[in-house]
C-alpha cells in the first residue's frame, strides 16, 4: 500500500508545485496527519465497510475536513472513492519526503545520554549538514542512557554514531577478528 500512497503524494506534490501552494498544502497536511494519526484503525473500518457508498465516504470527508485546501480535499475524495482513506498517514509521510527533498532538508533524531545544550546541538547539526550535504536539518532529540556517552544521529537511512557504546562494539569486533 506504500506504493499507492506514494502515487497520491506525488500527484499532490506536483499540483502543489504547479499552483505555488507547496507551503500551504504541507502545513495543512501536517495538521490533518496529527488529527488522524490515532484514528487509522477507524479509517480502515470506513474503507472496508461494504455498505458505505463512495458518496457517503465523501460526505464523511466534508463533515470532518470542512475548511481545507481544495487540492487536498480532491485528493481525499479520490482516497475515499478508492477506499484508501486509511492511507492518509502514508500519503503524508511520502509527501513529507518529497517536500524535504525539494528543499534539501530532512529530519534528524539526535540521541545522547543527557539533555544537550543549545551550543552542543548547533555543533552536531553543523556536523550533520556537512556529512549529509543537507541545507537544513530538522532536529528531534532523545535521551538514551544505553549509549553510555557521546551521541548518535539518525537522518533517513544514515546513522552517524559517535557513542561510547558504538566504540565498545567496534572494539569488540576487532578483538574477535584477531582471535
Curated annotation (Swiss-Prot):
Gene3D superfamilies: N-terminal domain of the delta subunit of the F1F0-ATP synthase
Alphabetic keyword roster: ATP synthesis, Cell membrane, CF(1), Hydrogen ion transport, Ion transport, Membrane, Transport
Positions of disulphide bridges: none
Membrane topology: Peripheral membrane protein
Main localization of the protein described in the UniProt heading: membrane
Keyword Mitochondrion: no
UniProt superkingdom: Bacteria
Protein's cellular compartments: Cell membrane
Gene Ontology molecular-function annotations: proton-transporting ATP synthase activity, rotational mechanism
Residues in the signal sequence: none
A GO CC term attached to the entry: plasma membrane
Record function comment: F(1)F(0) ATP synthase produces ATP from ADP in the presence of a proton or sodium gradient. F-type ATPases consist of two structural domains, F(1) containing the extramembraneous catalytic core and F(0) containing the membrane proton channel, linked together by a central stalk and a peripheral stalk. During catalysis, ATP synthesis in the catalytic domain of F(1) is coupled via a rotary mechanism of the central stalk subunits to proton translocation.
Similarity section: Belongs to the ATPase delta chain family.
Quaternary organization: F-type ATPases have 2 components, F(1) - the catalytic core - and F(0) - the membrane proton channel. F(1) has five subunits: alpha(3), beta(3), gamma(1), delta(1), epsilon(1). F(0) has three main subunits: a(1), b(2) and c(10-14). The alpha and beta chains form an alternating ring which encloses part of the gamma chain. F(1) is attached to F(0) by a central stalk formed by the gamma and epsilon chains, while a peripheral stalk is formed by the delta and b chains.
UniProt-recorded name of the protein: ATP synthase subunit delta
Species of origin: Staphylococcus aureus (strain MRSA252)
Amino acid at each position: 500500500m506504500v506504493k499507492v500512497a506514494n502515487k497520491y503524494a506525488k500527484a499532490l506534490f506536483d499540483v502543489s508545485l504547479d499552483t505555488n501552494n507547496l507551503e500551504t498544502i504541507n502545513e495543512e497536511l501536517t495538521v490533518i496527519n496529527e488529527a488522524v494519526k490515532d484514528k487509522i484503525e477507524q479509517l480502515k473500518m470506513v474503507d472496508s465497510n461494504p455498505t458505505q457508498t463512495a458518496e457517503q465516504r465523501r460526505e464523511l470527508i466534508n463533515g470532518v475536513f470542512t475548511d481545507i485546501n481544495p487540492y487536498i480535499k480532491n485528493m481525499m475524495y479520490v482516497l475515499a472513492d478508492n477506499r484508501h482513506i486509511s492511507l492518509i498517514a502514508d500519503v503524508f509521510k511520502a509527501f513529507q519526503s518529497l517536500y524535504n527533498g525539494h528543499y534539501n532538508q530532512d529530519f534528524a533524531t539526535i540521541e545522547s545520554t543527557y539533555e544537550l545544550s543549545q551550543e552542543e546541538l548547533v555543533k552536531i547539526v553543523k556536523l550533520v549538514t556537512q556529512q549529509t550535504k543537507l541545507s537544513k536539518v530538522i532536529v528531534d532529540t532523545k535521551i538514551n542512557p544505553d549509549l553510555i556517552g557521546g551521541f548518535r544521529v539518525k537522518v533517513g537511512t544514515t546513522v552517524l554514531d559517535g557513542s561510547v557504546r558504538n566504540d565498545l562494539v567496534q572494539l569488540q569486533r576487532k578483538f574477535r577478528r584477531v582471535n
